[in-house]
């Protein structure tokens, strides 16, 4: 049997330290909820083809939407200059434009908002000495990822403003994955500050839980490629694709590797395979943990994680069979975040709470 990893031994938490951890944890959970909302609104923006409706990046002035008919006409005129309007939405009315504008505007507003939700409390906790030393580099790293995400978001939008009629699937998948990394990192820190009970997890359990998180992240990246290519429309049957387990034409482009990123049929096929892999890994993890650590909190979490993956798989199948309706597709995206968040919390819990380190004077 593999030896258990001992939870870090730390000095007894004082009442003040316990309160500080509680407030920092509450703040981070608020950040997580905001991130969840951003990703869902981003998904709706993609599903409604709204992502290119705002053709400029104005970090400050962009908070204020058009306020009068003249400003709306000016905003619409800018949109009419890009290929998406010329080739896809020619003849769109101003009212129809407003419909797609508000999705993109809401997504950008939430993205700006989460910066304040994260940065201002971080500054407060820092200057008041409520942050333990080991938390500071972790939180600064998350803040840096947030700044990078803003730049990647505009880089993604810019890909659809000159020649394409949509954004690059490479950039969209990157944008989604970075958002999930921020979500993942925030969840890990929050869970590390929570009290832990029970015996430490075995090394094998902890390692498997980590790689399961990685597998979920990879699957989300593949889902980003599916969204970017509208690959969910390629085959709307299950379990077969075009009447076969392995459909024809998966590698019709040259070089062959390009199909993994640019052929909608191949991208959907790989995403399906990824789903089966995650499902099998979650099942294996649940069975192995139940055998190695019966009646432990780790085993119960592993079983619950497997059940969440099953629900996500069912929603994914429904999304295909129903030809990607917006509500079901958004439920699929939301469930992906729930699976990722729970998998991350589960992995972090196998390592125990952070050791207590007093904030530097």
UniProtKB/Swiss-Prot annotation:
Binding site for heme: 271, 332
Entry GO CC: plasma membrane
Family from the record: Belongs to the COX15/CtaA family. Type 2 subfamily.
Catalytic activity, reaction form: Fe(II)-heme o + 2 A + H2O = Fe(II)-heme a + 2 AH2
Subcellular location: Cell membrane
Membrane-related topology note: Multi-pass membrane protein
GO molecular function, one term: oxidoreductase activity, acting on NAD(P)H, heme protein as acceptor
Enzyme class: oxidoreductase
Cofactor: heme b
Sorted UniProt keywords: Cell membrane, Heme biosynthesis, Iron, Membrane, Metal-binding, Oxidoreductase, Transmembrane, Transmembrane helix
Origin: domain of life: Bacteria
Its EC number(s): 1.17.99.9
One Pfam family linked to the record: COX15-CtaA
Keyword Cell wall biogenesis/degradation appears in the UniProt entry: no
Signal peptide interval: none
Function: Catalyzes the conversion of heme O to heme A by two successive hydroxylations of the methyl group at C8. The first hydroxylation forms heme I, the second hydroxylation results in an unstable dihydroxymethyl group, which spontaneously dehydrates, resulting in the formyl group of heme A.
UniProt cross-references to InterPro entries, sorted A to Z: COX15/CtaA_fam (IPR003780), HemeA_Synthase_type2 (IPR023754)
GO-annotated biological processes: heme A biosynthetic process
Listed transmembrane segments: 22-42, 109-129, 139-159, 175-195, 208-228, 269-289, 303-323, 324-344
Pathway: Porphyrin-containing compound metabolism; heme A biosynthesis; heme A from heme O: step 1/1
Main subcellular location: membrane
The gene coding this protein: ctaA
Self-association state and partner proteins as the record states: Interacts with CtaB.
Protein name as catalogued: Heme A synthase
């Amino acid at each position: 049997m593999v030896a258990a990893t001992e939870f870090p031994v730390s000095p007894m938490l004082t009442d003040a330290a316990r309160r500080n951890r509680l407030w920092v944890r509450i703040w981070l959970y608020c950040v997580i909820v905001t991130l969840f909302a951003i990703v869902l609104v981003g998904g709706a923006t993609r599903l409604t083809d709204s992502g290119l409706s705002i053709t400029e990046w104005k970090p400050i002035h962009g908070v204020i939407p058009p306020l009068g008919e003249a400003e709306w006409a000016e905003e619409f005129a800018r949109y009419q200059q890009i290929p998406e309007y010329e080739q896809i939405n020619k003849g769109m009315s101003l009212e129809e434009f407003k419909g797609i504008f508000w999705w993109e505007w809401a997504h950008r507003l939430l993205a700006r908002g989460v910066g304040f939700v994260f940065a201002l409390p971080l500054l407060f906790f820092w200057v008041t000495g409520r942050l333990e030393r080991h938390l500071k580099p972790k939180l600064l790293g998350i803040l840096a990822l947030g700044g990078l995400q803003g730049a990647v978001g505009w880089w993604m939008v810019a890909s659809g403003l000159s020649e394409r009629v949509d954004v690059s699937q490479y950039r969209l998948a990157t944008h989604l994955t970075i958002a999930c990394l921020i979500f993942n990192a925030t969840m890990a820190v929050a869970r590390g500050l929570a009290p832990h009970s029970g015996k430490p997890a075995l090394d094998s359990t902890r390692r498997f839980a980590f790689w399961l998180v990685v597998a979920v992240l990879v699957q989300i990246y593949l889902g980003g490629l599916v969204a970017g290519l509208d690959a969910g429309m390629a085959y709307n049957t299950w379990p077969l694709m075009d009447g076969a387990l392995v459909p024809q034409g998966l590698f019709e482009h040259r070089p062959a590797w390009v199909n993994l990123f640019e052929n909608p049929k191949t991208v959907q096929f790989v995403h399906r395979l990824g789903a089966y892999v995650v499902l099998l890994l979650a099942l294996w993890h649940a069975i192995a943990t139940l055998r190695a650590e019966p009646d432990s909190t780790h085993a119960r979490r592993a079983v619950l994680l497997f059940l969440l993956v099953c629900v996500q798989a069912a929603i994914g199948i429904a999304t295909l069979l129903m030809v990607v309706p917006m509500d079901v597709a958004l439920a699929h995206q939301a469930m992906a975040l729930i699976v990722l968040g729970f998998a991350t919390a589960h992995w972090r819990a196998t390592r125990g709470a952070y050791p207590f380190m007093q904030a530097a004077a």
